[in-house]
């Protein structure tokens, strides 16, 4: 199958959208911490109810054996991380997990497959899975890697609501993290997703030895997507033994909160998801993230192959903070 590059105005100014230069975003990062959180909270309240939170559950439907060399990922076939490879799960098993997620309050069911990208033969089964989960009354999101021509349209027709395709890190830092694809590969698939009419879930990871300027570059790249992503997951690196980033320098908690706040200010109408890494965050840190504009979490004890807070703990935290699930 021939893959045609789609030209998309991803990182160019738009007359109806504020253009965020890296310098401008970096200046936001330099704002005194409490003032930055306050500004982000004000922006958040203009566009969202600050006392509701969107709950998503993420399930790995095909695990391990990925040919990519992403330095953060325990599912890469290039690293010895103890992850057990698992082929694409059957529809029935996925539907059972989706039913449990719905019964526990999740409104969106996200499915991830460890591929560079799906092959044409995989799409038939994926569309069957999407239809079955949609029949439960859940929103659906898929993260299956780089898409070939026509695949996004097939996923849309099956009922997929969101496609997750993170840009990972700033363009300037990309080759330090991934060598088997480049930044433009991600933009190409994002263009196909938009063209098919799917909603975009697109974010990145912080704590991968990047500089603050490179964190600003990540946020600027996301904020200048046209249109901006409906959902922006901000992940804190989960360091896994066996991956090249297992010994990455620890990111100070205030810097992570700053990243959430800057994402909220630059993407005021997007859901900002407090994503991977929550297991290592205190309740106080998570509360600061919600104050700074995060209004979505992954809900469930596992994120693909890494640990996530258990539902009971999240319910308790939400009760303490008077947060209610979005309906």
UniProtKB/Swiss-Prot annotation:
Question: What assembly does the database describe for this protein?
Answer: Homodimer.
- Per the entry, which co-factors are needed? [4Fe-4S] cluster; [2Fe-2S] cluster
Bound how, and how many: what does the cofactor note say? Binds 1 [4Fe-4S] cluster. The cluster is coordinated with 3 cysteines and an exchangeable S-adenosyl-L-methionine. Binds 1 [2Fe-2S] cluster. The cluster is coordinated with 3 cysteines and 1 arginine.
Gene3D superfamilies the UniProt entry points to = Aldolase class I
- Residue positions annotated to bind [2Fe-2S] cluster are 110, 141, 201, 273
State the gene name recorded for this protein: bioB
One GO BP annotation here? biotin biosynthetic process
What are the entry keywords? 2Fe-2S, 4Fe-4S, Biotin biosynthesis, Iron, Iron-sulfur, Metal-binding, S-adenosyl-L-methionine, Transferase
Binding residue positions for [4Fe-4S] cluster: 66, 70, 73
- What PANTHER family would the database entry show? BIOTIN SYNTHASE (PTHR22976), BIOTIN SYNTHASE, MITOCHONDRIAL (PTHR22976:SF2)
Q: Which domain of life is it from?
A: Bacteria
Q: Which GO terms describe its molecular function?
A: 2 iron, 2 sulfur cluster binding; 4 iron, 4 sulfur cluster binding; biotin synthase activity; iron ion binding
Q: What does this protein do?
A: Catalyzes the conversion of dethiobiotin (DTB) to biotin by the insertion of a sulfur atom into dethiobiotin via a radical-based mechanism.
Protein family membership: Belongs to the radical SAM superfamily. Biotin synthase family.
Q: What is its EC number?
A: 2.8.1.6
Know the name of this protein?
A: Biotin synthase
Per the record, a Pfam family?
A: BATS
Tell me the InterPro entries matching this sequence: Aldolase_TIM, BATS_dom, Biotin_synth/BioAB, Biotin_synthase, Elp3/MiaA/NifB-like_rSAM, rSAM
Give the catalytic activity.
Answer: (4R,5S)-dethiobiotin + (sulfur carrier)-SH + 2 reduced [2Fe-2S]-[ferredoxin] + 2 S-adenosyl-L-methionine = (sulfur carrier)-H + biotin + 2 5'-deoxyadenosine + 2 L-methionine + 2 oxidized [2Fe-2S]-[ferredoxin]
- The main enzyme category here is transferase
């Amino acid at each position: 199958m021939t893959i045609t590059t789609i030209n998309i105005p991803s990182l160019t100014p738009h007359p109806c959208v504020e253009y965020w230069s890296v310098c401008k975003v970096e200046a936001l990062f330099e704002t005194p911490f409490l003032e930055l959180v306050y500004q982000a909270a004000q922006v958040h309240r203009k566009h969202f109810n600050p006392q509701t939170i969107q709950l998503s559950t993420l399930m790995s439907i095909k695990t391990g054996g990925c040919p990519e060399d992403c330095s953060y990922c325990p599912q890469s076939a290039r690293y010895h991380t103890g992850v057990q490879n698992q082929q694409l799960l059957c529809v029935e098993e996925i539907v059972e997990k989706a039913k449990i997620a719905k019964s526990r309050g999740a409104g969106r069911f996200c499915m991830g497959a460890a591929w560079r990208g799906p092959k044409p033969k995989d799409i038939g089964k994926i569309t069957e899975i999407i239809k079955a989960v949609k029949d439960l009354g859940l929103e659906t999101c898929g993260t299956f890697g780089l898409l070939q021509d026509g695949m996004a349209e097939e996923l849309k027709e099956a009922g997929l609501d969101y496609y997750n395709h993170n840009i990972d890190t700033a363009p300037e830092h990309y080759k330090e993290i991934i060598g088997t694809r480049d930044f433009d590969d991600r933009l190409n698939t994002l263009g196909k997703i938009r063209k098919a009419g799917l909603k975009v879930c697109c974010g990145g990871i912080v704590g991968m030895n990047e500089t603050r300027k490179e964190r600003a570059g990540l946020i600027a790249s996301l904020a200048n997507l046209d249109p901006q992503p409906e959902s922006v997951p901000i992940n804190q690196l989960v360091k896994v033994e066996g991956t090249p980033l297992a010994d990455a320098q620890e990111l100070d908690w205030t810097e992570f909160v700053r990243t959430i706040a800057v994402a909220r200010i630059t993407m005021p109408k997007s859901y900002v998801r407090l994503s991977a890494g929550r297991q290592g965050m205190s309740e106080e840190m998570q509360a600061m993230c919600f104050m700074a504009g995060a209004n979505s979490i992954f809900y469930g004890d596992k994120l693909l192959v890494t640990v996530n807070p258990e539902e009971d703990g999240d319910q308790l935290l939400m009760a303490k903070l008077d947060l209610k699930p979005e309906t």
